[in-house]
From Swiss-Prot:
Disulfide bonds listed in the record: C23-C29, C24-C34
Modification sites for Glutamine amide: Q35
Organism annotation: Conus lividus
Tissue-level expression: Expressed by the venom gland.
Assigned keywords, A-Z: Acetylcholine receptor inhibiting toxin, Amidation, Disulfide bond, Neurotoxin, Postsynaptic neurotoxin, Secreted, Toxin
Name this protein carries in UniProt: Alpha-conotoxin LvIC
Length: 38
């Protein structure tokens, strides 16, 4: 993964990690970062 996403923009890396985790739990966002997670 590129470590960046549209939702996170250029936020701190910890924020990006949280955003990706939240994205995993979000069915609308799921798949962008969490392919195969669900």
């Amino acid at each position: 993964s590129n470590g960046r996403n549209a939702a996170a923009g250029d936020k701190p890396s910890y924020w990006i990690t949280l955003a990706i985790t939240d994205c995993c739990a979000n069915p609308v966002c799921n798949g962008k970062h969490c392919q195969g997670r669900r």
